[in-house]
Amino acid sequence: MEFILSLIGSLLLIICVLVSVAFLTLLERKVLGYIQIRKGPNKVGLMGIPQPFCDAIKLFTKEQTYPLLSNYLSYYISPIFSLFLSLFVWMCMPFFVKLYSFNLGGLFFLCCTSLGVYTVMIAGWSSNSNYALLGGLRAVAQTISYEVSLALIGFKILLFSLL
């Protein structure tokens, strides 16, 4: 019974995160509309609230294309795995009710975010294009350098909170 409740809580958390990201992009589009002195996405429904759902429908109905010489399976699995990792990181965040109790939640966060490097590398490699491979390797180097500084800042905060 506890497993079913944690599964329902996890699914509810994932749905809430995805919907909140959709509405944050709506907020971003509205702010950009005001900054650029043009009409933002206020025309659909009441204050543009149905706009994220229309965008989701548009994204799911787009035609799926892939490069001719690419590795088909890894080309499509790597972005899905990246999305899965970014949603999996939310499981260790302490909310009103903890879904999963981790003693080493910070280490789990660093491990999950560092796995995202492999998805970028596999996505660049699987397209069988030299330019995509070089772009993927540049993104890997940049991500690793940012993760080192993130880990050092996190350990510094942890160290000063214990003193």
Curated annotation (Swiss-Prot):
GO CC field: mitochondrial inner membrane
Pfam families for this protein: NADHdh (PF00146)
Catalysed reactions, as listed in the record: a ubiquinone + NADH + 5 H(+)(in) = a ubiquinol + NAD(+) + 4 H(+)(out)
Topology with respect to the bilayer: Multi-pass membrane protein
Alphabetized PANTHER family for the sequence: NADH DEHYDROGENASE SUBUNIT 1, NADH-UBIQUINONE OXIDOREDUCTASE CHAIN 1
Function: Core subunit of the mitochondrial membrane respiratory chain NADH dehydrogenase (Complex I) that is believed to belong to the minimal assembly required for catalysis. Complex I functions in the transfer of electrons from NADH to the respiratory chain. The immediate electron acceptor for the enzyme is believed to be ubiquinone.
Family statement drawn from the similarity comment of this UniProt entry: Belongs to the complex I subunit 1 family.
Name of the protein in question: NADH-ubiquinone oxidoreductase chain 1
High-level lineage: Eukaryota, Metazoa, Ecdysozoa, Arthropoda, Hexapoda
Gene name of the encoded protein: mt:ND1
